[in-house]
Amino acid sequence: MNSAPRTASLWRYDLQQSLKGSFTARAHGLRLTTKFALLNSEGKNFGQLQLRGLSIAEFESGDRAAVLTHTEGRYRMVAEGEEILNATPKGQSVDKLEISCGGRTYEARVSFFRNVAVASYGRGGGRAAHVSGGLVGRSYQVIFAPEDGCALPAAIFLLWHVAANRRRAYRMGRPMGRGAM
């Protein structure tokens, strides 16, 4: 695998176009869960995001799949054996990330207590993806730039990152320290 993530593959492009820039994630069942149903703007299920702890998640939509991982301070999204996105914390910060996808770099800001994450195009650029969750973290609204081939993967990554780390942030009373995410 080369270190530069590729641009959007065909499976992401058609999914991204059909979603038209937004989707909702809803937790399954009545208990706190780690499995989210992903719904389009008409409320129809188009996939799921299964969280498997803080270090791995699986995104599935039809016959498409991607695995999200966190190891040694680096996040990756891999689909069909190819890295399509990677992210690293900016400096010592636990709430700022640098996301790379398809030759582009995005700056992401995360607030675990507010249950919000935003990925923007560099300094002062517009938003590529915005994830905002409900008070208890069982529902998330996701908005992304439909014309940007990497905005959907960035949105899915941010959804996982916020949902997986939010509960831990509340238990600890503050965001995780360096290397704990």
Question: PLM features: what roles do these ranges have?
Answer:
Residues N2-G47, L51-L54, Q92-M181:
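Low-complexity or membrane-interfacial segments used for flexible interactions
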Residues G73-S100:
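Helix-adjacent hinge/juxtasegments
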Residues Q48-E83:
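Short, well-structured hydrophobic secondary-structure segments
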